[in-house]
């Protein structure tokens, strides 16, 4: 049950934007997540301090360097993995 609550909390914080061109609000970072179909998420900048989020960023750097195909930060992992990793930050 706690896992379900943490996933619901993650969905609130990881608000998916439908407009790719909109700017991220202050204190948030836009990232594109997914393997073939990329979805845009807004994550709090505090996630940058989390070791597991830093590992996702390292994976992104290895795959894309500084040339991201979406024009923003792209994290090459399945969407459910991203949600699982980031849902742990709310505990």
Curated annotation (Swiss-Prot):
It comes from the Eukaryota. The keyword Transcription regulation does not apply. Induction: Strongly induced by auxin. GO terms for biological process: auxin-activated signaling pathway; response to auxin. One of its GO terms (cellular component) is plasma membrane. Keywords: Auxin signaling pathway, Cell membrane, Developmental protein, Growth regulation, Membrane. It is a peripheral membrane protein. This is Auxin-responsive protein SAUR20. It comes from Arabidopsis thaliana (Mouse-ear cress). The gene is SAUR20.
């Amino acid at each position: 049950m706690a896992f379900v609550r943490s996933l619901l909390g993650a969905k609130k914080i990881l608000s998916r934007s439908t407009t790719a061109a909109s700017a991220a609000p202050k204190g948030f970072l836009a990232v594109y997540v997914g393997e073939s179909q990329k979805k845009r998420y807004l994550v709090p900048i505090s996630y940058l301090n989390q070791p597991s989020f830093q590992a996702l960023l390292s994976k992104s750097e290895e795959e894309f360097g500084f040339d991201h195909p979406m024009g923003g930060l792209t994290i090459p992992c399945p969407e459910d993995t991203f949600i699982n990793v980031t849902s742990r930050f709310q505990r």
